Amino acid sequence: MNYAEESLKKHGEWKGKLEVVSRVPVSTKDDLSLAYTPGVAEPCLEIQKDVEKSYEYTRRWNTCLVVTDGTAVLGLGDIGPEAGMPVMEGKCVLFKAFGDVDAFPLCIKSKDVDEIVNTVYLISGSCGGVNLEDIAAPRCFEIEKKLKEKCDIPIFHDDQHGTAIITLAGLINALKVVGKTKEEIKVVVNGAGAAATAITKLILSYGVKNVIMCDRTGAVYEGRKEGMNPFKEEMAKLTNLEKKSGSLADMVVGADVFIGVSAPGALTTEMVKTMNKDAIVFACANPTPEIFPDEAKAGGARIVSTGRSDFPNQINNVLAFPALFRGAFDVRAKDINEEMKIAASLALANLISDEELNEDYIIPAAFDPRVKDAVSKAVAQAARDSGVARI
């Protein structure tokens, strides 16, 4: 199938992938008086007395806003908020299909951090959570940070944390297959953008000790002058504690794990040959990975994962964000924290039994029917245990 031509045709037929459907009947005078005036005044007054009642008397409890400024849409780049709308609608469809979450797109015509933050904050009383989507770095970090400080609902940048959750799930199972522990491995993360930063932070939170981040300049380390910014400075303090300098090729020597969220062809077969025995390669650049699975295997990699559906072990965010929000909403969480993300990763990893686990099956399939319940329950429990659940 030619997906480009067929998708364009279908979008023309669909004229939007979302619609509003009433949950209540309005076929009699009594129906109208209950759903609207005069009866509707009573829940309004209850919410006025206690804003938390908005979760009980409206659909706020299950509503997520999918927010973008259109500056980093898929691999298309800065195409504008209107052009990003088909992606945001698609994201909302996935929220409903895989998490039973009611999601609505909000495409903002601004690139100003404070303007975007203020816009989302001012309407945050209408929803139970916010999914930030396709916002270019480094502004995505600033927007998420400021919204988390201002809002008392989950603020989640999927391009960062969704990718990190699936990557950690895959890493947990990959380590089981090769018989290594998180404490002993050396991990090289190639890329210093949104996804790379979140992956690095999450695997460190999980207990991985030795992580080196690389960008176009080479290894990121504390004291490096070239090509740094405040976000890389932060990562330099958390990673590469020996302050090693050099190229990506230098850093992967002796590494157990390569995680790429960078550029096509960044890793070569020759570089994989210099890695440790039973190397694990996560080549997640899309649509062309840092290295293709056959090339990585030729270099000695035992496990290879990509972001593509035509190869085994796909890093697919749809395994995370719908069920993650489902779990957060079920306990009316105020935040999505590291504990909840790690719980989601562990739940995903544990869906694959030791008997099923192998080099080509370390991550559940996108359509695995067990994902929603397993992840949402684990996330909800982690929210309770970490003190961010309201109920």
Predicted feature locations:
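Short, acidic/small-residue loops that bind anionic groups at enzyme active sites
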Residues: 150-166, 283-286
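Rossmann-like adenosine-cofactor binding region
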Residues: 233-302, 308-310
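General beta-strand structural signal in soluble alpha/beta enzymes
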Residues: 105, 131-134, 155-158, 189, ...
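Adenosine-phosphate binding glycine-rich loop
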Residues: 158, 178-180, 283-391
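Solvent-exposed alpha-helices and their adjacent loops that cap or buttress functional pockets
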Residues: 12, 55-60, 65, 96-97, ...
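Glycine-rich phosphate/diphosphate-binding loop of Rossmann-like nucleotide-binding domains
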Residues: 74, 79-99, 157, 165-263
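N-terminal ligand-binding/catalytic initiation module
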Residues: 1-155, 376, 381-382, 386-390
